[in-house]
Structures are given as structure tokens and as C-alpha cells.
């Protein structure tokens, strides 16, 4: 999964959720799908955390120049 892209992992996670919600999997199949889903969810979460750390916002100063500031999400 190290070379996998976020979008690919997210699509796989969405498919796993659809299969689990469908209710047609056996218990063993459900557990395997759940384990795979947890791996994809963890990967996606890590990628989102990395992206958030990289986001910078340009702020205009009073003198008209710009400065780069780390992204601070509103919580």
C-alpha cells in the first residue's frame, strides 16, 4: 500500500463499505473486508494528515506584501 494513491485507497474503502452494508458476505468474508477497510482508512487518514501539514495560506500584510503561514483549520 506504500505506493498506493489516496484516491485509489478511498475508492477501495468505499467499495468495501458497500459490500459490508450489502449484508451478503459471510462472517469470515466480512471480517476480512473489515480488516482491509481498516488498513485503507488508516492509509487515507495518514495521507490527509500529511496534506494538512503541507497546506499553507498566503496572508496579505498591511504593507501589501504576502507572507506564508501554516494552515490553521477552524475548529
UniProtKB/Swiss-Prot annotation:
Pfam families: Exonuc_VII_S (PF02609)
Keyword entries, A-Z: Cytoplasm, Exonuclease, Hydrolase, Nuclease
GO biological process, one term: DNA catabolic process
Record-listed E.C. numbers: 3.1.11.6
GO MF term (any one): exodeoxyribonuclease VII activity
The UniProt record lists the keyword Membrane: no
Compartments it resides in: Cytoplasm
Keyword Hydrolase: yes
Domain of life: Bacteria
Main localization category: cytoplasm
Gene3D superfamilies: Exonuclease VII, small subunit (1.10.287.1040)
InterPro entries: Exonuc_VII_S, Exonuc_VII_ssu_sf
One GO CC term, this protein: exodeoxyribonuclease VII complex
Catalysed conversion reaction: Exonucleolytic cleavage in either 5'- to 3'- or 3'- to 5'-direction to yield nucleoside 5'-phosphates
Assembly, per entry: Heterooligomer composed of large and small subunits.
Similarity comment: family membership: Belongs to the XseB family.
General function of this protein: Bidirectionally degrades single-stranded DNA into large acid-insoluble oligonucleotides, which are then degraded further into small acid-soluble oligonucleotides.
Protein name: Exodeoxyribonuclease 7 small subunit
